[in-house]
Structure formats: C-alpha cells, structure tokens
Amino acid sequence: MNKSELKPALVFEQFAKINEIPRPSKHEENMIEFLKSFGEAHQLETLVDETGNVLIRKAATPGYEHAETIILQSHMDMVCDKLVDVDFDFHKDAIQTYVDGEWLKAKGTTLGADDGIGCAIELAILASNDIEHGPIECVFTRDEETGLTGAHGMKAGFMTGKMLINLDSEDEGEIFVSCAGGQTTHATFHFSREEAPAGYFFMEASLKGLNGGHSGDDINKKRANAIKILARFLFLENEKLDGSLRLVSFNSGKMHNAIPRDGKIVFAVKNADKEQVRADWNIFASEVEDEFHVTEQTMQFNMSSSDAAPVIKKAVADKFVMALQAVDNGPLTTCQDEAIAWMVETSSNVASVMTDESSINIVASQRSNVMSNLANMTNTVKAAFLLAGAEVTVGDKYPAWKMRANSELTDLAVKAYEKLFGKEPLVKGIHAGLECGLFSERYPELDMVSFGPTLRNVHTPDEALLIPTVEMVWDHLLEILRSVAK
C-alpha cells in the first residue's frame, strides 16, 4: 500500500494538506487562515471567534433542512516532538509521512494525527457533494494540547447544534461518553550557584528510549517516567555518598501532557567516588531494566564525564531531589463503579523538569473523573513541593465530562455501528481530558459522544495511525449523519 491508495481518498487528501501547515499549540495562525480559505472557497458560512476557534456551517442536503443540527468537532493544533537527531522546525517544516504496513507514520516526528485526522474528516464532510445529512457545524478549536484554550474561550452561542461528535479519540470501536478533568501544578526552586569544592569530578547521566506517551490515556500501561527514574538515582546515590553529591542540572520532559521518555542530569562527586558511582549507575540501570522488562525494552542508560560548572547550592538541590522522590506519580485510584472498575479514576504525572542559571522549573499534571479527588490530588502534589521550599502555582482546571443518562446520540452511534459492522462498540469513559468537559459546562444540554480511528504512541515520534480504521470511522460517521437527518 502506498499513500496514493489510502482510503477514504478525500480524507487522506485533506490530511496531507493539513500536514503541510505548521500548527504547534499556541501557534495555529496558519491553520486558522487555511480553514477560513477552505470555507470561503466552498462558499460556506465561516466564523472565527475571539479565541481563534473556527466554525464552518454546511446546509442540509435538500429534503433534510428540518433535521437536528449536528456539530462535528476536532482541534487544529498538534503536539510537536521529534527524535533527538532529527533536524526539523515545527514552525516552518511540513510533516513527512510514510506507510508502514497498515500504519501511517511520520519520519522522526509526531504525525499530527492527534487531531489532524479529525480535522481531515470534517473537511472531507464539508467538501463532499454526495453525503446525506442535516445541517452541520464543523468546529475546529485551537490550542487543545497545552491548555484547552479554544474550548475555554468559546462563548455560549458560538455553536448552535444540540448534538456534538468529538473526533479526538484514539481507538476505533470505542465510543466515549465521559472523560477526566485535569489540572497542572507548577513548582519552581530558586537558587544561587557556587563553585564545587576542590577535588570533585563532573559526570553526566542520561536516559533515553522510553515509550513515553499520553499522560492520561497511557498512564496505566506501566511505562517508565524518565524524571522519576533519574530523581531516584540521585536520591539513592546522594544517600550512599553521605550527602556529598552536588547537582549542576536536571532536564527532562517537554510537554505537560506527556510521560517524559528521556532526560539528562549533570552532577559532581568526589574524585575518590567516581568509579563507585559508575558501578552504582550500572547496577541501578540493570535493576530498572528488570522492573520494566516488558513495557520498556528499548531504554538506554548512559554515563560520561562532563565539563566543570558551578553547582546548585546544596540545601536547595537536596530538597528538590527529595521532592521529586516523594511526589506521587502514575495511576493512583480506579473508579468505584463496578461497570468501569478497571478504569483509572485519579492519576498524576511529573511531566517536565527544566534547569536554568537560577531556577529549576517543574510541571506536574493531575487528572481525575471526580473533581473533588482532582482537587485533593493537586493539593497533595502542591504540598510535597511546598514542604521542600518551592514556589508553587496551580494552573486552570478543566472539568470532567459526566456520562449522560438516556443519551439519544449514544444510542444512534451504537445502532449505526452495529448496523455497519455486526457487533457492538464499547461504550466507555477515558482517563484523559477532552474538550467535551468544557463544552458540557458552557452548553449543559449538549448531547455528546467521542470516537475516532486507532492511533498509537500519540505525543511521541512513534505516533502511528491505523489506516483501515479511518474508513471505518468515516462510514460510521456517515451512517450517524444519515440517521440524524432521517
């Protein structure tokens, strides 16, 4: 299979166009202009709100003008991540894709199918002339990945439909009817630097090759967190060296909503201890590799000498390492309802640590399907960093989307799936934030579902789209549109 044979052709044509457009989160200007031009070229009513969300309306197929208006929604931004050795500028370069068996992938970067494929499906609906449907509103929100900015900023009345299909889910055959709420915690350790004592040797330790992944949807997959592993080594080694280890820098993770998959620490130890530290690192690496021998088979531990540099004041560095060792990470509780007892209810992810000349900045993200538990988890993380002397702020929260009893749209979506594929879809919730949570606050009467084609390893350069599932989602969506229209 080559790219010219991908089906539905109209969807993949639109996806190819989208991947020519740089669209990092918070930098969606080119995508907004593309969508405006698309709407105008097809003579469709096109609106852009103050936040930058785009809405394109398409009139009903003749004879279905009085049908219920249905909203199709996706987000226009993408997570930008690449392999370390890949030369790529997400603000200028087009995503380069290739077919690998039944999967569509990108060359060394994120693919942008989250949620570019949702946008492509919407554009294909708008461009098509042979689909039966009632009135449609196609909505493209901005900056979903780094703050749900578009959904936060959307005012009541921008959308007018009473049913909404969100096209930002990642497992074909699953229909999502609820999602977790979330919040981020930001901790900063301020410090001054000093010269290391005489007789110290500088070392660099790095970890790479972890799977990473989405900090909501993948949090229960027993994947390693690079930050927690490196912090664990520093804590253990400093204890073993009677507190003589001196920290220069700690850098790991890039995005608040991804599990960090690589990282690097620079530190100094007494000359007399350097060989012991190397031996300890190798033992530590073997232990961690054994702990994750199923889920992390490509992790790589490296250690080398490093140039001398001013070290962080010891009192601050030690408290920083202790805080990272102590702070909760991973899935913490599962849902109490028996029907979904398998699903993560509350989690936390230490997402990024960045060191500059005078501060260490940490971002951790908390999620829960129960808003009171979200507040408690956020306070738990906050308290750990406050106890260590950090300056802590908490970001805006987004609400959970609660399952709607007697949802007409869920019923339509399930029946359409059964008609097409002869089996029941899985109706479930997701431990990740969807814009549906914010829409449910602004539009409390909105009946919503979320589904999409199968994606793997989102938010990483290994992101992949399962090609056959795109046609399945397309057919499913068209059947729902026909059902609503009739």
Task: Locate each region found by the language model.
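Active-site-adjacent substrate-binding region
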Residues: 225-227, 232-250, 403-446
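Midchain, well-structured core segments that form catalytic/ion-binding scaffolds
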Residues: 102-105, 145-146, 156-367
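Zn-dependent metallopeptidase/amidohydrolase metal-coordination segment
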Residues: 7-11, 345-361, 421-479
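Substrate-recognition/cap regions that form aromatic- and gly/pro-loop-enriched pockets
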Residues: 343-432
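Acidic/His- and Gly-rich active-site-bordering loop/insert found
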Residues: 2-102
